[in-house]
Structures are given as structure tokens and as C-alpha cells.
């Protein structure tokens, strides 16, 4: 029942490999399937260098459908999307959600993007952190997303200025709102390969999420086929250590629980 819930395609202009190549690696890792979640098109020119264009959306849907048919009976391939959120994007995102039958809609705030920094960074990094965590909560409150992706990504922007203790107040306020909205949050293993060497989110944030009974979704944010299910074993160990007993997947935009013990047993080593 374990799926890779966060992965990309070359249409985002910074990933390599077709969906079938990701499926092949998923099969080797013992996964039941993958949900392709490439970066969404926008209708206002927001960060066009890291996403498909509106004119490429039909190609994206067809690419995933072709792979689904090719791999049917071996690896279950589903269509998803990772959509950027900032306040004011809601009408377009609502339209986009109706343009295809998505199985998993990730909501993302990318504070390292130039467009985001230009609009929201005032020179005060502490204030920037507050804005970021406020936007995560706002994204959840829209009801447009199943899962909030890589939820402490702001630490990547300026590592020398990131202060977790300072940010915890903003984090907890954000988590209160996300929990009330009933939105899941991602545990993204790509953070283990950064200078921090920790998940997105970090352990203290995971503990606060657990206190609020926020369900978690595991994803590697794979931009290369070889990254499918990367470090899932480590992430499951960390989640168990924190106190989580289940992870979740979304299929047909419905959340399904998987015991961590079951997920761990499903994974194959390569």
C-alpha cells in the first residue's frame, strides 16, 4: 500500500526522467505505486522557470496517463500536482483543481524563489519566517490542498539566520491552524541531503504536529528516478521515535492510513 507521494517530471525544467522510469525504481523498492506531483502551471507568470506552462498541462496529464496504462498491474501510477500558494492565488488554484482528476494535491510555499522573496522579504529574516509559516496555515485553510509540503523549507533560504527556537512560536501558531483545517503535512526526506541533514520538518516540529494529531504523508520529492522512496527507512525510524504510529497516502483525494510497521516491511533494499 506504500506509495511515493511526491515526485516530478522534466516539465518542471529542473527534474529528469519520465514517469515510467520513476515507476521502475518504485517497483525495485517494493512500492505499490507512485503519485506524480509536478509543479503546477500558473496563469500569472509566477516563477515560470521552475514549472510547466499552462499550455503544457494537457501534455502532463497525458504523460501520466500513458505511463499508468503501460505499468498497469505492476506499479499503480496516479496523477497529482504540487501547487504553489501565496495569498490571492486561490481562484486559479480552484480552477486548476477542476482541470483533471487528481489523486493528491500538495500545497507548497517556496520561500527561496526569487518571486517570493521579492514580494515578501523586507530584510528582516525573523519577519520572513513569520510570513512563511502564516502562508502555510493560510494554504491549509483554503481547503484546496490535501497535504502541506516540506513545511519548514524556509530554513533553506538563509541557513546562517535560521533560528528554530525563535521560530517555534510562529510554527506552533501555524500548526494550530493547520490542525483545525484538517490538512495533512508532508514528511519530506529530501532535507536529509541538505547541510542540515534533517527531514522537512525537523524533529521538534514533528513533535508539535503529533501533539495536534496532524496526519503525515511521506515523500522523497524525487526529481530523479533514483530518488524514489529515498531515505524512507530513516524517515520511518524518526517518525517512530517521535511517537507516530501511522503514515498516510492519498488516493482519489481520500486519506488512507498505513501502519509504520507495515510500510517498513514493504520496502525493499537495492
Q: Where in the sequence are the language-model features?
A:
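A structural motif
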Residues: 31, 102, 144-145, 214, ...
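Flexible loop residues that form catalytic
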Residues: 39, 110, 153-156, 190, ...
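Extended substrate/RNA-proximal surfaces in nucleic-acid metabolism proteins
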Residues: 47-181, 263-270
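Charged catalytic cores and adjacent phosphate/nucleic-acid-binding surfaces used
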Residues: 1-9, 19, 162-270
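An N-terminally biased module of ancient metal coordination in phosphate/nucleic-acid-related enzymes
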Residues: 1-83, 87, 157-158, 163-166, ...
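Non-catalytic positions within long, well-ordered alpha-helices that form the structural scaffold/packing
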Residues: 23, 27, 98, 140-141, ...
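Hydrophobic faces of well-ordered beta-strands that scaffold small-molecule active sites
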Residues: 3-7, 34-36, 77-81, 105-107, ...
Amino acid at each position: 500500500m506504500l506509495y511515493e507521494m511526491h515526485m516530478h517530471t522534466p516539465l518542471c525544467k529542473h527534474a529528469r526522467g519520465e514517469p515510467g522510469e520513476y515507476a521502475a525504481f518504485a517497483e525495485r523498492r517494493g512500492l505499490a505505486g507512485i503519485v506524480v506531483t509536478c509543479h503546477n502551471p500558473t496563469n500569472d507568470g509566477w516563477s515560470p522557470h521552475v514549472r510547466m506552462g499552462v499550455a503544457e498541462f494537457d501534455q502532463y496529464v497525458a504523460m501520466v496517463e500513458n505511463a499508468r496504462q503501460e505499468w498497469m498491474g505492476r506499479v499503480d501510477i496516479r496523477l497529482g500536482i504540487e501547487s504553489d500558494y501565496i495569498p490571492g492565488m486561490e481562484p486559479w488554484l480552484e480552477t486548476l483543481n477542476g482541470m483533471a482528476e487528481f489523486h493528491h494535491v500538495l500545497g507548497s510555499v517556496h520561500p527561496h524563489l526569487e518571486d517570493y522573496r521579492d514580494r515578501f522579504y523586507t530584510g528582516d529574516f525573523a519577519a520572513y519566517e513569520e510570513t512563511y509559516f502564516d502562508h502555510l496555515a493560510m494554504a491549509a485553510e483554503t481547503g484546496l490542498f490535501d497535504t502541506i509540503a516540506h513545511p519548514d523549507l524556509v530554513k533553506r533560504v538563509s541557513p546562517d539566520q535560521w533560528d528554530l527556537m525563535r521560530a517555534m512560536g510562529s510554527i506552533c501558531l501555524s500548526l494550530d491552524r493547520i490542525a483545525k483545517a484538517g490538512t495533512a503535512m508532508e514528511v519530506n526526506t529530501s532535507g536529509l541531503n541538505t547541510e542540515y541533514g534533517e527531514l522537512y520538518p525537523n524533529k521538534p516540529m514533528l513533535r508539535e504536529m503529533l501533539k495536534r494529531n496532524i496526519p503525515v504523508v511521506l515523500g522523497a520529492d524525487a526529481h530523479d528516478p533514483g530518488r524514489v522512496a529515498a531515505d524512507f527507512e530513516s524517515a520511518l525510524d524518526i517518525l517512530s521515535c517521535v511517537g507516530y504510529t501511522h503514515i498516510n497516502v492519498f488516493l482519489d483525494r481520500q486519506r488512507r492510513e498505513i501502519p509504520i510497521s507495515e510500510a517498513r516491511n514493504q520496502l525493499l533494499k537495492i
